[in-house]
From Swiss-Prot:
It comes from the Bacteria. The lineage of its organism: Bacteria, Bacillati, Bacillota, Bacilli, Bacillales. Pfam families: DUF1054. Belongs to the UPF0637 family. Transmembrane segments: none annotated. This is UPF0637 protein YktB.
Length: 212
């Protein structure tokens, strides 16, 4: 099986100074693994969601000065792109790997989906494990662990999605660098697979909006 677990070298890519130097190493070391992860998990996510899912590896093409602080592969039910659609991500920062279900700022269904999340809040907390984390900004590494959030904090996150133009909502897991380095390839893939099985619930909720 192709080696898809990230290594020390992969994490260290995001400490390299300069856009060109970092991108050169990213293309050589990280991107092939993201591509392999995309090919590996697209069929899994298609089966979990009932939608044919297509992988999109981040190209960072618009960058001209600042090097990327993270990189990822996203999965959405369109070959053309993912940013406007409910999607999943696997990626890494210098410090950790992330596995997300995501609705980001370009999504046109944010308001309706936020209302649906608010109505189904109790069901969501029962379906999403307490060890999972929530984020309101995909460009920042900071997160809120579900076990440390009260009902009002989660409700605020859902309300924000309805009312703030640039609002985002992400839910998933973070695997710290040391934890990933201590896994073998199969253990790494299994953790991602397990997370997607839990996160598919949030995707299926979006289908109530998109297929209405």
């Amino acid at each position: 099986m192709t080696q898809m677990r990230f290594t020390e070298e992969d994490f260290n890519t995001f400490t390299i100074e300069g856009l060109d130097a970092r991108m050169e190493v990213l293309k050589e070391t990280v991107r092939p693994k993201l591509t392999a992860l995309g090919e590996h998990f697209a069929p899994t996510l298609s089966a979990l969601t009932g939608d044919e899912m297509f992988p999109h590896v981040a190209k960072h093409a618009r960058r001209s000065v600042n090097p990327p602080a993270d990189s990822w592969v996203a999965f959405a039910n369109s070959k053309r792109g993912y940013k406007k659609l409910p999607h999943f991500q696997i990626g890494l920062w210098e410090s950790h790997v992330f596995v997300w279900f995501a609705i980001i700022y370009e999504s046109p269904i944010k308001e309706e989906y936020g209302k649906l999340l608010e109505v189904n809040q109790e069901t969501i907390t029962k379906n999403i494990p307490d060890s999972f984390v929530w984020s309101a900004d995909h460009t920042k590494p900071g997160v809120h662990k579900q076990s440390e959030m009260d009902k009002e904090q989660l409700k605020t996150l859902f309300e924000r999605l309805q009312t703030v133009k640039k609002a985002e909502l992400l839910c998933g897991i973070q695997l710290q660098k040391e934890e990933v380095l201590n896994m073998n390839n199969q253990e790494f893939l299994q953790r991602i697979d397990d997370a997607f099985k839990q996160l598919a619930f949030l995707y299926r909720l979006t289908q109530k909006v998109t297929q209405a």
